[in-house]
From Swiss-Prot:
GO cellular component, one term: plasma membrane
Transmembrane segments: 28-48
Keyword match Transmembrane helix: yes
Molecular-function annotations in GO: penicillin binding; peptidoglycan glycosyltransferase activity; serine-type D-Ala-D-Ala carboxypeptidase activity
Gene name linked to the record: penA
Pathway stated in the Swiss-Prot or TrEMBL entry: Cell wall biogenesis; peptidoglycan biosynthesis
Gene3D superfamilies, per the entry: 1.10.150.770, 3.30.450.330, DD-peptidase/beta-lactamase superfamily (3.40.710.10), Penicillin-binding protein 2a (Domain 2) (3.90.1310.10)
Swiss-Prot/TrEMBL domain comment: The enzyme has an N-terminal penicillin insensitive transglycosylase domain (formation of linear glycan strands) and a C-terminal penicillin-sensitive transpeptidase domain (cross-linking of the peptide subunits).
Protein name: Probable peptidoglycan D,D-transpeptidase PenA
Entries under HAMAP family matching the protein: FtsI_transpept
Chief localization: membrane
């Protein structure tokens, strides 16, 4: 029997389907294709670099050279007290080659032209370039700018230009002995260039650069070796170019006129000890020092010792007055006399002279008798105090200390001869400095080549009253009856002293070789300028200090007073001599 059921199966609800992200077959294909193309491009580029441009890139890489170039510090400028430039450094270029990198030598025509431009023989150039192991060899230093441009136009490979600085001396011979010169690397060799080297030089810098074969800088590279240069210090000297010019010209005229071996002049500021002028002849051009010999380069005013002759007498007279060993009224017997077997005499015999007469007539007898009133040790100490036998520390290299033998070794006659300038030696600059003890009211001043901002401290040698008395006595030397009338300057009272010394040659005093000296100051009451002149071995028109060194002294003193704007201290004569402005 068939039974019908009322049951109906119950339908379960449909599960909600989670939508999965759809991945596009097209997009996948695109990405894969892009990657494939990229790799294919890289492979192709690699093949291209290896096959097509390898030689080109290799050549470009070979053409790039990393170098560390010096950045030269600019050397300090040297100028006179008024700003006239005496030494300066200007940019220049130097040429070097890199033989190690050269694939082939320059052509014969290129070498010939290069030889003409740099003034180096072709054979020398070829020998330099054939040194294949070298990566640096100088061809020519410090080329003229026009020449450098012409060399660049040759297009030579592995020839490189290096920036440098070249020293120039605009005044040429005029300041040669004071300034000196540098070598080609800019290092001081003589004069103030040497003594002030540390101040003038500064500190070079460095820069790492990339150069091409022609030496052109392609790029500057960052490097811990890079350093900026520190320029040198500018120096202002005490010298006055106007006075220096005057002194140099008058000195040369005198040396030529008297057919002398050499000459020297020193001009000091009598109040400060500053050197206003210092000149020697013969001289040289510091721009071409290699053409000068040792005689031309020698700064005689500082390095050469001379016996001062009678120019030392004012100090002996001053010492006697200062110590109360004499006075202006005393008359001394000035007849010739002997010390042991050695005679002491004057050029002209005077029976007796007072102190003024001893100064005016330049009496050896009178001066030696004043010196004899002191012990040898006391006179030795006195000369030493004046700076004889002592370095001045002027700042100039090679300065002499002079010569003063120990008093214990003096023979009886030597104390006498020293009183009139024989047996002791000093430089002309030392002698001029000693005169500051008279011009600065008894105080010995230091000398300086650099301009002084503050008045220097000196050392007292005499009482102020003594210095003034001696200055007054020295005016008589340039007045009628004195030995130095040739040095008189119109409109001024000039205090001066002449000196004539026979030269010591081969162990004896020569009869025909002399040093003529004239030294003095003006105005006498309030001195502003000291001038000292020596003419070495005059052979024509006389040899006495007053005759030979007096005329250039007169011109230099008169001109210096005029240049400095110092007014005359007494009426001018009708025949007043015109002095340079």
């Amino acid at each position: 029997m068939l039974i019908k059921s009322e049951y109906k199966p119950r339908m379960l609800p449909k599960e909600e389907q989670v939508k999965k992200p759809m991945t596009s077959n097209g997009r996948i294909s695109f990405v894969l294709m892009a990657i494939a193309v990229l790799f294919a491009g890289l492979i192709a580029r690699g093949l291209y670099l290896q096959t097509v441009t390898y030689n080109f890139l290799k050549e470009q890489g070979d053409n790039r050279i990393v170098r560390t170039q010096t950045l030269p510090a600019t050397r300090g400028t040297v100028s006179d007290r008024n700003g006239a430039v005496l030494a300066l450094s200007a940019p220049t270029e130097s040429l070097f080659a890199v033989p190690k990198e050269m694939k082939e030598m320059p052509s014969a025509a290129q070498l010939e032209r290069l030889s003409e431009l740099v003034d180096v023989p072709v054979d020398v150039l070829r020998n330099k370039l054939e040194q294949k192991g070298k990566s640096f060899i100088w061809i020519k230093r410090q080329l003229d700018p026009k020449v450098a441009e012409e060399v660049k136009a040759l297009g030579l490979e592995n020839f490189v230009f290096e920036k440098e600085l070249k020293r120039h001396y605009p005044m040429g011979n005029l300041f040669a002995h004071v300034i000196g010169f540098t070598d080609i690397d800019g290092k001081g060799q003589e004069g103030l260039e040497l003594s002030l080297e540390d101040s003038l030089h500064g500190e070079d810098g460095a820069e790492v650069v990339l150069r091409d074969r022609q030496g052109n800088i392609v790029d500057s590279l960052d490097s811990p070796r890079n350093k900026a240069p520190k320029n040198g210090k500018d120096i202002i000297l005490s010298l006055d170019q106007r006075i220096q010019t005057l002194a140099y010209e008058e000195l040369n005229k005198a040396v030529e006129y008297h057919q002398a071996k050499a000459g020297t002049v020193v001009v000091l500021d009598a109040r400060t000890g500053e050197i206003l002028a210092l000149a020697n002849t013969p001289a040289y051009d510091p721009n071409r020092p290699g053409r000068a010999d040792s005689e031309q380069r020698r700064n005689r005013a500082v390095t050469d010792m001379i016996e001062p002759g009678s120019a030392i007498k004012p100090f002996v007279i001053a010492k006697a007055l200062d110590a109360g060993k004499t006075d202006l009224n005393e008359r001394l017997n000035t007849q010739p006399y002997k010390i042991g077997p050695s005679p002491v005499r004057d050029t002209h015999v005077y029976p007796s002279l007072d102190v003024r007469g001893i100064m005016q007539k330049s009496s050896n007898v009178g001066t030696s008798k004043l010196s004899a009133r002191f012990g040898a040790e006391e006179m030795y100490d006195f000369y030493h105090e004046l700076g004889i036998g002592v370095r001045m520390h002027s700042g100039f290299p090679g300065e002499t200390a002079g010569l003063l033998r120990n008093w214990r070794r003096w023979r009886p006659i030597e104390q006498a001869t020293m009183s009139f300038g024989y047996g002791l030696q000093l430089s002309l600059l030392q002698l001029a400095r000693a005169y500051t003890a008279l011009t600065h009211d008894g105080v010995l001043l230091p000398v300086s080549f650099e301009k002084q901002a503050v008045a220097p401290q000196g050392k007292r040698i005499f009482k102020e009253s003594t210095a003034r008395e001696v200055r007054n006595l020295m005016v008589s030397v340039t007045e009628p009856g004195g030995t130095g009338t040739a040095g008189a300057v119109d409109g001024f009272d000039v205090g001066a002293k002449t000196g004539t010394a026979r030269k010591f040659v081969n162990g004896r005093y020569a009869d025909n070789k002399h040093i003529a000296t004239f030294i003095g100051f003006a105005p006498a009451k309030n001195p502003r300028v000291i001038v000292a002149v020596t003419i070495d071995e005059p052979t024509a028109h006389g040899y006495y200090g007053g005759v030979v060194a007096g005329p250039p002294f007169k011109k230099i003193m008169g001109g210096s007073l005029n240049i400095l704007g110092i007014s005359p201290t007494k009426p001018l004569t009708a025949a007043a001599v015109k002095t340079p402005s």
